[in-house]
């Protein structure tokens, strides 16, 4: 039945797009004397720095280590934002939930406009608010800091950004929009924005928005309000000021149901939960930076940012623990209600001063930075736990009632001062040495009060304070070689630490001093010749155990999930090796990586067979490793864009579990094999857009402790299209399906989506648009996620807002400055 439905949808949408495009083409021929007016790509001369491309413009080009994306051939609807534009670029992907933007597997850390930072590198704000029509060219590259540019030495940290070159018609003009979207199920959006861009990098932006479209979770009163602004101002040729500010408020209520299977030596244990959570957050953020080129040999950089937030929340959770695959044989049942509140602040200050000592490039740099945060939270919890295997005083099930109020303030402060000396050896090689002083301090506390007893006494056994102070010295050695075909960069940072740890719980206090050494080696080698490039990269770093992992007081607010610290933890060392090969002519990218961790931090789970309660404490463990490989291909054939990618991922996870019947913890190992294939095709003529997608995802896991195997296979397909019609009319539609198959999947997990928009643009320059959108026409939206770890199998389902209609009115303006 579902295959027939899918077939009918594909035929219906394909027929609709074909009919509309035929009508559009016939009308165009009638007004142009029978000569087709559409052409996918425009012949023109393009000047890109020192690179000149003559003839038909390619979508994606490479210039040294910069990827250039020419967007003139991409067709987007009127009033589209930057997010709608990047969806039509092969290899570009954006995850709305995680706010992560990537291109061909490389994660992008920020968005620039004409070479300058926009909105403090807030990717979501840039994608949702920048008008796509203002974009002339997209550039992707590893952005060096001003200090790295001045010294000529890369510090080894990758910082890939998306840099937007705006069209000349937008530069110097005031452009913006006013929008109001309102529809059924209470969905709405009201927005106003204004932008001023300049080719030299100066920009000014102001955005205000109130909406609830970003969340599809079922809940009452969900919304987000935000106001943000950004400014870049250049005072002469030597001084650049950048600032951004934002304030936001949101409320989110979510329902969820989850299911878990925990891997134990005596067999698999099961857990089912349902929860209703609600939270409200108010946050403010400000960012400022100054770049002052005092003279040709002297540079000063200053940057600062700060934030504050206030949160309130509540939750109600019901949990059932049982030993067999049926909730009828219940081991323990519980309800937990919580009410939370908190406030948090953070700050960051950084400055560096560099002076070149001669024309060869010898330089000395002084850098200082400081950052910190504080968090004050309170939690009121009421739990009722019924143990069906334990007898109470009256002979029935044992019942535990716990009503606790907890205050948990925490503070963290970090500072660093370093001096670096850079010496060129010839024109291609530079060496750098640095020495620095480091200071870090962390303090955590918890006060617990028994609200179930008269007078609400303080519970000393659940209260305590802990602190960690680290004083260190660091030595930095780096080299940077830039040749015709080779670029080699590498170095190591060694930090000698003296760690003072203290804890007080009740009348008992403990103080100790430890000495440790941290290593952070990095090495990168790139080779490029013609259309081929090869890159190898190694990263490693030592991580000391956090204060919370070392000395967290026992937390029993949830009797079925108790957490405690482990003062015997050792530092861990993580390393990763990446290899990447690109061939521009054939559009191929081959990449792979391997990573593993020595003395990794993992939680040992102690399981009580009588109650089902779990106690977690952090331990060191070895055996966690991953291997990943991917192959990507893309090709442009006139107005057609084709791309595909395949990915394989192998993961080996290790955990420890201990049951009340065991004297030694059992080692739980889980091997997971993931694979995926994605195919993408689009046709982008002048009259619109047609896109086809298909994907296949495989995941197989095997837990050796219980010999449990979990398999899942997802199939996905989609079609989308935009058609421009006469008289300012436009039709947009998309349909997709997600078929989930495997060990736990059923047909009810499948998702079928079909959305359609009809828009009419009017006024003299079509600057106003009235549209109607029907979202999720089939009312088959689903949100279910499954995952496997060394501890357990986990799945969670969140009910979604389904079919709704949205009416929109948007007005765009472009006010050009008179010459």
Locate each region found by the language model.
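Conserved C-terminal beta-signal and adjacent last beta-strands/turns
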Residues: 676-698, 706-819
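Extracytoplasmic loops and strand-loop junctions of Gram-negative outer membrane beta-barrel proteins
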Residues: 121, 175-177, 268-274, 329-337, ...
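Sec-dependent N-terminal signal peptides
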Residues: 5-13
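Signature of Gram-negative outer-membrane beta-barrel scaffolds
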Residues: 404, 430-528, 537-538
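Outer membrane beta-barrel strand-and-loop segments of large Gram-negative receptors
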Residues: 416, 458-464, 474, 564, ...
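Outer-membrane beta-barrel translocator domains and adjoining extracellular loop/strand segments
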Residues: 151-152, 217-220, 253-269, 313-330, ...
